[in-house]
């Protein structure tokens, strides 16, 4: 797999915001789709996987509607539901995000998130306790924390939540 192609696609001047954007440094949709086509051609012929990777890259570049359309195609799939939840979290449609996270049950991505987020949250034991009760990632608590940061109740945590 040519990971560097995907790293380039995710390179932006700032992390994605907690809300829908827009922000500077993101690619235009048509150019981004061409770049995603080229990168995916090298790594997989699995349409579902390709589509979901595309949805996540489009979402990273603040193309929420295009990402949402793709995620909706895979609503009955755990990976598709997880992507769908992330899209709704960014919109922000918090209750819908929680619905889709509940549908995914205990998605395998949550173990990876717990490990990586744990490193980032080391300096904030309170937030760590909220997002990772008993050491496991809680996607619904993450949605709640993002909502609180977005409405100004926890602005000091916004940057940490963006990186997570």
Predicted feature locations:
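Extended hydrophobic/aromatic segments used for targeting, binding, or gating
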Residues: 78-79, 95
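TPR repeat positional signature
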Residues: 51, 81-84, 88
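Hydrophobic alpha-helical segments, chiefly the membrane-spanning helices
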Residues: 160-164
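Conserved alpha-helical segments that form or flank metal/cofactor-binding pockets of metalloenzymes
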Residues: 93-100
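Structural register within alpha-helical repeat arrays
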Residues: 54-55, 84, 96
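N-terminal alpha-helical interaction modules that lie
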Residues: 1-77, 91, 103-159
